[in-house]
Amino acid sequence: MRVLVACEYSGKVREAFRKLGHDAWSCDLLPADDGSEFHIQGDCVPVIMRGWDLIIMHPPCTALCVSGNRWYGRGMPKHQERIDSIEWTTGLFELAKQHAKSVAMENPVGVLPMKATQYIQPWQF
């Protein structure tokens, strides 16, 4: 299975899929922490458009999480940053759905205008 892990530079998720025999790649604006040749440093949009069986996305959560309401809520100085982040993330998710058979997005409880299909806690694994 061809797997893209977007917005990931640690390589942890990519390597877990590679160990299972999948053709897994990561992509982020930052270089890979592990220096892997299976990491694409750059904008994930053109990489998503290459077509994948599975895309897992880890968009930056700073402005997207409810825990940031104190700084990013309505009327706060960083509210526009939150709006921009929501628009970018939802656009990325819609793009991924067009170019992959399956799409997953990891993020803490947030403010995105889409309903989560499931919640998974780290202690469950």
Predicted features by range, described:
Residues 6-7, 28, 36-52, 61-125:
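Class I S-adenosyl-L-methionine
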Residues 56:
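N-terminal Rossmann-like NAD(P) cofactor-binding module of classical short-chain dehydrogenase/reductase
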